[in-house]
Swiss-Prot record:
Belongs to the dihydroorotate dehydrogenase family. Type 2 subfamily. Keywords: Cell membrane, Flavoprotein, FMN, Membrane, Oxidoreductase, Pyrimidine biosynthesis. Monomer. The active site is at S173. It is found in: Cell membrane. One of its GO terms (biological process) is 'de novo' UMP biosynthetic process. PROSITE patterns: DHODEHASE_1, DHODEHASE_2. It catalyses: (S)-dihydroorotate + a quinone = orotate + a quinol. This is Dihydroorotate dehydrogenase (quinone). It comes from the Bacteria. The lineage of its organism: Bacteria, Pseudomonadati, Pseudomonadota, Alphaproteobacteria, Hyphomicrobiales. Pathway: Pyrimidine metabolism; UMP biosynthesis via de novo pathway; orotate from (S)-dihydroorotate (quinone route): step 1/1.
Amino acid sequence: MIRAFDAFSLPLLRLFDAEDAHRLAIQGLRLLPQVKPRPDDPKLAVRAFGLNFPNPVGIAAGFDKNAEAPDALMRLGFGFVEIGTVTPKPQAGNPRPRLFRLERDEAVINRMGFNNDGSEAVLRRLAARAQQGGILGVNVGANKDSSDRVADYVALIETFAPVASYFTVNVSSPNTPGLRNLQQAAALDDLLARVIEARERVRPSAGDTPVLLKIAPDLTLGELDDVVHIARSRKVDGMIVANTTLSRSPLLRERTRMNEQGGLSGRPLFRLSTRMVAETYVRAEGAFPLIGVGGIDSGGAALTKIRAGASLVQLYSALIYKGLGLVESIKTDLASTLLRTGRDSLAEIVGADAPTITAEEWPV
């Protein structure tokens, strides 16, 4: 069924503006038959952040910003779904056009600006599907015009704790002016302290919801030292590495699009984000697991991310070019690798290549 859907939808969606195509894709997912996914190979199961993931392949925030199709995505075989970024108040985001395909590079540039329906509408949707199960993360961010951005994060933790499997604190989007300043040491320490306090306040009624921190790939190694140190000291449950990049590789082929303002994702981000996964893994010293994001478009790419230090991986941009069948393809490749190498689980290879990767020349 998925192959047929991809064969029909991918050429059709290319005829539309990138954002319109995305909107159509979300609507199309909601129309798919409610067929149970094929059972995952038990060897692909991952335990991380106190949660049991059926497989390590998730969909990154940004695809289903408003929690319109999380269950359809789970039925497609994703091991977990992350919705958002959600802000307290509804937000229109930046003016269009704000989403661009770089087709020859299999990349995307976006400057969306946290466009979303706001916490009230998204909470209503999540509450309505609360009995469906599955691991559903909520990616939270601050409103652009907020006078107290930290208070926005705190409010969102308190709002979504009853329905979130985990939280992602997004301080790394490049498309909200000043947001990345929250990655600076003093600001980040204050933010995480208040977020963890909020989580503790709602624990009696909502349980112990893991809190993850999502970082940019553009941090210097000195800045990464500070970020990981603070994350460890504030006892966050994990990190997501990494968001989109503001850098532009000279190897990009779509010269007319490459200088569009915004964050770059997709295949050109793979080497940089993988290096940042390895650097973070080495610094975390086993304190918490990582989710690796950026340029994963095959089973081999997912395996590289895992061997760099990621316990789980997330996709988004590659789905635009490879289709939804990519999910099962990656899982099949990972299971085959475990069988071929005589491994019982992916946990046995997490971080195996991190020392080698961190010793390599910095990626261009």
